[in-house]
Curated annotation (Swiss-Prot):
NCBIfam families associated with the record: glmM
Protein name, per record: Phosphoglucosamine mutase
Keyword presence, Coiled coil: no
Assigned keywords, A-Z: Isomerase, Magnesium, Metal-binding, Phosphoprotein
Length: 445
């Protein structure tokens, strides 16, 4: 059984992700981190899901049973855990969240002592330990060796200071009216505080978490309500975060939801103009052709990687870059954060608006994405795509018609994701039927 997916361990709380799995996984991770342990402290944070209490207690039980001391900091954004793990000199950090998923899902993400997400080799090692009864049993401690747990509620200030430090000192948000949709999630306290302390006129929506309403018709995956509020309050811009605030969706003053690649493009150009862009901009293989053209136009080098913000980070380290992201809204400013941080990205976009004295729509309209169609097709078997008879011919045929294509399996479900991109939406709709028919046959869907 494989535990780790594209972003940690994730599943239905109380079913796949129950208290037993959480406790044993924490023990396995603790054993893995022991080799480099310096302080014997591990930081644990969570979003606002009800199941977070169950999983948090199970993780604390697992870690203290093998001798770790645990620092619990309650609901905080995922990027805050990455920052605070290093800032508080912990041996590791653990975030309990299923990000943009509904409340009934949950997940566990791990960070090393420097606040970096674990690579696949580290995850594979933790899985190996998880299934090794002997190693788990030998790691148990007794008597005075059993660890302690303490809850600290005031670390939010450290993270707020770090976020504010990413905003240019010579600017103020006093001239901006901003609507924030915090998705009843982990940023419900942090985001309004940061924007208000920097001077913005702030309207907050969906900031009443009850454990069951996280991401429910709100936040980064449902920005239409935010769009209505932006128009209603005549705001300059709207920012929507997801449940753990590691992604951002922007709504302009007209109530138009920005495309993720438009956001990446204009922020990359902003960094270049300031002389702050190091090396290549990194986006994923799903990025829009219009982004590539925009970056080429401004002579900004560009590289692509697999889908997932940890792969964006890996590629940035490889090429010595400091900016990249995903179409979905994970945007990484690695000079300021170790992972995608919706708040940092929101402040940088605000700084761009103020620096150029332009509206959000004027800025975002510089990158006009080509139409894309993304269909998720249920399948019964995940066959090796490189060996599928007829697939190369299908791709070449699409290419001749001016259609870019990308086909990839879901990391967590029996789905294949079919992405087509071209300048003509009607052509896309027609060819998607051909593509779906092909995969239905070869993958026995």
């Amino acid at each position: 059984m494989k535990l780790f997916g594209t972003d940690g361990v994730r599943g239905k709380a109380g079913e796949f992700l129950d208290s037993f799995l959480a406790m044993r996984l924490a023990m396995a991770a603790g054993i893995y981190f022991k080799d480099k342990a310096l302080t014997n402290n591990i930081l644990v944070g969570k979003d606002t899901r009800r199941s977070g209490y169950m999983i948090e207690n199970a993780i604390v039980s697992g870690l203290t049973s093998i001798g770790y001391n645990v620092i619990e900091i309650g609901p905080m954004p995922t990027p805050a855990i990455a920052f605070l793990t290093e800032d508080m000199r912990c041996d590791a950090g653990i975030m309990i969240s299923a990000s943009h998923n509904p409340y009934y899902d949950n997940g566990i993400k791990f960070f090393d002592a420097h606040g970096n997400k674990l690579d696949e080799q580290a995850e594979a090692k933790i899985e190996e330990i998880y299934f090794n009864d002997k190693l788990i049993e030998e790691a148990r401690t007794t008597k005075s060796q059993i660890g302690q747990a303490k809850r600290i509620d005031d670390v939010i200030g450290r993270y707020i200071v770090s976020i504010k430090n990413s905003f240019p000192k010579e600017l103020t948000l006093k001239s901006l009216r901003v609507v924030l949709d915090v998705a009843h999630g982990a940023s419900y306290k942090v985001a309004p505080t940061v924007f208000r302390e920097l001077g913005a006129d702030v309207i907050v929506i969906n900031d009443k978490p009850n454990g069951l309403n996280i991401n429910e018709n709100c936040g980064a995956l449902h920005p239409l309500n935010l769009a209505l509020e932006v128009k209603k309050f005549r705001a300059d811009v709207g920012f929507a975060f997801d449940g753990d605030a590691d992604r951002l969706v922007v709504v302009d003053e007209k109530g138009e939801v920005a495309h993720g690649d438009s956001l990446l493009g204009v922020l990359a150009l902003f960094l270049k103009k300031q002389g702050k862009l190091k090396s290549s901009v990194v986006s994923t293989i799903m990025s829009n052709g219009a982004l590539k053209e925009f970056l080429t136009k401004y002579k900004i080098p560009h590289e692509t990687c697999n889908v997932g913000d940890k792969y964006v980070l890996e590629k940035l380290k490889e090429c010595g870059g400091n900016f990249g992201g995903e179409q979905s809204g994970h945007i990484i400013f690695s000079d300021y954060a170790k992972t995608g941080d919706g708040l940092v990205a929101a402040l940088q976009f605000s700084a761009l608006m103020l620096s150029e004295a332009k509206s959000a729509s004027e800025i975002l309209n510089q990158v006009k994405p080509y139409p894309q169609l993304l269909h998720n097709l249920k399948i019964s078997e995940k066959k090796d795509l490189s060996k599928l008879a007829g697939l190369e011919e299908l791709k070449k045929d699409l290419e001749k018609k001016g259609i870019a294509s990308l086909f990839r399996y879901s990391g967590t479900e029996n789905l294949i994701r079919l992405l087509l991109e071209a300048k003509d939406i009607k052509l896309l709709e027609k060819e998607m039927k051909v593509v779906e028919s092909f995969f239905m046959k070869v993958l026995n869907a």
